[in-house]
Amino acid sequence: IKGNDGGSSVTALTIDMSAAGAATFNSTVTENSDERLKSNIHTIDNALNMVGDMRGVYFTKDGVAGTGVIAQEMEKVLPEVVKENDEFKSVAYGQVVGVLIEAIKELKKEVETLKEAS
């Protein structure tokens, strides 16, 4: 695939698809994140509580072991990361990163407060 759609530039890309629907790319997959494309930008609050409400799971899908989350559970915590097609729900894992970053920062603040108190 070659092209430039104004937001992503691809010069050479190989995608290997498995029968189970897994895709392997020979390059990095990125998502547009330019500030100029976004509006209503604000920091995520209560991220640590959100992470506390998430459940990481081990599972087997199509005979292959994996780790992740359950879309129906994530929908209750962070509905904007759950997508649905005709049959199944999926999770945009990359969109969870902002919550994880802010949760780590909240933990860091708590650790610093505890260190100062001791």
PLM features: residue spans?
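C-terminal intramolecular chaperone/autoprocessing and neck/assembly modules of extracellular spikes
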Residues: 23-94, 107-118
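Right-handed beta-helix
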Residues: 1-11, 19-20, 31-35, 79-80
